[in-house]
């Protein structure tokens, strides 16, 4: 679809692998190139973080790019830890995330992924959000990718993200849902260009 690869700004090898896999599937594969750019990260919602990061990355790289921010919101805690999940996980681990909900019957949570796309320097990033509902469970499966071992999506047939084969996870994940919207947008833009 694209004449040159789309730049994904991340230093996270697991995210890069998933994004490449998801965007290369289907009838209009999108080739991804990685750039790890050290950018300051503001505190805010996933939308605010992704948009700011994308704007800065496009300026630094001088080209079109995508950035991502994720969140895990516990419904009993009114959406916390949300975009700060990375810090909660680093400080508390999987067991600590479960302990946060020990006093609540409601263990439901939403996994949220927000991608921002910028056509290049000086353009306002466009936001694509994906959301997958599920619940927080004691860790199951390999604990190698963030909080995957404690998140059991409703559509996961009783498996955590970590227990799922990647091809199954990548059909229902929050990341897949956001990237599917991004793919549709990029295809529509490519069609406009061809018809001009």
Curated annotation (Swiss-Prot):
Binds 1 divalent metal cation per subunit; can use either Mg(2+) or Mn(2+). Its cofactor is Mg(2+); Mn(2+). InterPro entries: ITPase, ITPase-like_fam, RdgB/HAM1. One of its GO terms (biological process) is deoxyribonucleoside triphosphate catabolic process. It is found in: Cytoplasm; Nucleus. Pfam families: Ham1p_like (PF01725). Keywords: Cytoplasm, Hydrolase, Magnesium, Manganese, Metal-binding, Nucleotide metabolism, Nucleotide-binding, Nucleus. It catalyses: ITP + H2O = IMP + diphosphate + H(+); dITP + H2O = dIMP + diphosphate + H(+); XTP + H2O = XMP + diphosphate + H(+). Disulfide bonds: none annotated. The keyword Hydrolase applies. Its EC number is 3.6.1.66. ITP binds at residues 10-15, 53, 69-70, 86, 145-148, 169, 174-175. CDD domains: HAM1 (cd00515). Mg(2+) binds at residue 41. It is an enzyme of class 3 (hydrolase). GO terms for cellular component: cytoplasm; nucleus. Gene3D superfamilies: 3.90.950.10. It comes from the Eukaryota. Belongs to the HAM1 NTPase family. NCBIfam families: RdgB/HAM1 family non-canonical purine NTP pyrophosphatase. Pyrophosphatase that hydrolyzes non-canonical purine nucleotides such as inosine triphosphate (ITP), deoxyinosine triphosphate (dITP) or xanthosine 5'-triphosphate (XTP) to their respective monophosphate derivatives. The enzyme does not distinguish between the deoxy- and ribose forms. Probably excludes non-canonical purines from RNA and DNA precursor pools, thus preventing their incorporation into RNA and DNA and avoiding chromosomal lesions. Homodimer. HAMAP family: HAM1_NTPase. This is Inosine triphosphate pyrophosphatase. It comes from Coprinopsis cinerea (strain Okayama-7 / 130 / ATCC MYA-4618 / FGSC 9003). The lineage of its organism: Eukaryota, Fungi, Dikarya, Basidiomycota, Agaricomycotina.
């Amino acid at each position: 679809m694209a004449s040159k690869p789309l730049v994904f700004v991340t230093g996270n090898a697991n995210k890069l692998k998933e994004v490449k896999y998801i965007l290369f599937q289907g009838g209009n594969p999108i080739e991804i190139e990685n750039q790890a750019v050290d950018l300051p990260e503001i505190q805010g919602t996933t939308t605010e973080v992704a948009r700011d990061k994308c704007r800065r990355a496009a300026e630094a790289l001088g080209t079109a790019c995508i950035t991502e921010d994720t969140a895990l919101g516990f419904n009993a805690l009114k959406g916390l830890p949300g975009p700060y999940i990375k810090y909660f996980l680093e400080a508390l681990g999987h067991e600590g995330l479960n302990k946060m909900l020990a006093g609540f019957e409601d263990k439901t949570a939403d996994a949220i992924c927000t991608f921002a796309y910028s056509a290049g320097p000086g353009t306002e990033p466009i936001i694509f959000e994906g959301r997958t509902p599920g619940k927080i469970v004691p860790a199951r499966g390999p604990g190698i990718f963030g909080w995957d071992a404690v998140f059991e999506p409703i559509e996961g047939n009783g498996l955590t993200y970590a227990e799922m084969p990647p091809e199954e996870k990548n059909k229902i994940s929050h990341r897949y849902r956001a990237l599917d919207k991004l793919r549709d947008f990029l295809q529509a833009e490519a069609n406009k260009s061809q018809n001009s």
